[in-house]
């Protein structure tokens, strides 16, 4: 997966995080589908290719799964069940951190990625 991370992913996720934070309702909730909408809007605003947006969505879904979300793809398409915006922001922040680690690899991290 490391070779499939678009250069624009970090910026897309940061803009998405800001948008989701702003659009949360008064109860501090949002729909998972709103995260996908915000991803798409961020990508369009940055002028990136649709494939880069989809790859960034895949990174987010994998991050969500690593944080315990059983069906992240379904959550990102859901417009009926609200989730706490804190949960959405945690997913987005973790994805940003993960991409940041890829952009600034530490000594020895390549071997741990290859073996894992």
Identify what each model region corresponds to.
Residues 16, 20-23, 39-46, 63, ...:
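Generic structural signal for hydrophobic core residues of well-folded globular domains
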Residues 2-5, 65, 84:
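Position-driven detector of the extreme protein N-terminus
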Residues 67-116:
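Amphipathic alpha-helical binding modules
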Residues 30-41:
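Active-site nucleophilic cysteine motif
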Residues 1-31, 92:
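Short terminal alpha-helical segments
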